[in-house]
């Protein structure tokens, strides 16, 4: 996994400041309506994907194809069950978030290792089947191999999360 705190200041269009907790649970927004410099955003994702590939060499090659960026707004009621991604690498970047939720896990991204591990519990068994929670704080960023599962904890009333999701084409 590659972690970073990436300041989105200067990349967000004024329309990002007009977002609120009111609206559909999941809103897909064209990236160019929220991100003013898509080339700069792509470069930031590319840096994370390169770092991820370097940490996993030789099993995970750096992306040679395109990096696709999607922008979503998550609001009350949105959640995503654990699922994998067909991309070789995927990354999330929290661009903005509304008020802090009552439950710290509300709107959090959960990254999990879907492997169950060895049948005999041991210290080595803890290497498999673990998970990591990334809270919905502006600037939070993580890149992971696409085979890891990701989920989103249910978003609370009065909360919204603006997120850019990048994936590499296989």
Residue ranges and their predicted role:
Residues 1, 88-90, 141-143, 161-163:
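Intrinsic-disorder/low-complexity, polar/charged segments enriched in Ser/Thr/Lys/Arg/Asp/Glu/Gln
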Residues 1-61, 68-70, 78-79, 108:
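Non-heme Fe(II)/2-oxoglutarate
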Residues 45-48, 136-137, 150:
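Hydrophobic, well-ordered secondary-structure segments
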Residues 63-65, 85-87, 158-160:
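Residue-level preference for beta-strand/loop junctions
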Residues 70-141, 153:
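Catalytic core of non-heme Fe(II) oxygenases with the double-stranded beta-helix
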Residues 90-93, 158-170:
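A short hydrophobic beta-strand segment most commonly corresponding to one strand
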């Amino acid at each position: 996994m590659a972690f970073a705190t990436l300041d989105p200041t200067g990349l967000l269009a004024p329309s990002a400041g007009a977002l609120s907790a009111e609206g559909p649970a999941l809103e897909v927004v064209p990236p160019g309506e929220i991100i003013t410099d898509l080339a700069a955003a792509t470069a930031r994702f590319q840096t994370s994907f390169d770092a991820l590939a370097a940490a996993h060499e030789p099993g995970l090659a750096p992306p040679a194809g395109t990096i696709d960026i999607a922008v979503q707004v998550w609001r009350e009621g949105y959640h995503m069950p654990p699922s994998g991604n067909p991309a070789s690498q995927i990354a999330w970047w929290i661009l903005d978030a509304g008020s802090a939720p009552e439950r710290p896990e509300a709107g959090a991204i959960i990254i999990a290792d879907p492997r169950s591990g060895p049948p005999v519990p041991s210290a080595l068994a803890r290497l498999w089947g673990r998970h990591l929670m990334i809270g919905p704080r502006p600037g939070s960023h993580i890149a992971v191999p696409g085979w890891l599962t990701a989920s989103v904890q249910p978003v609370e009333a009065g909360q919204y999360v603006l997120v850019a999701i990048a994936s590499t084409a296989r």
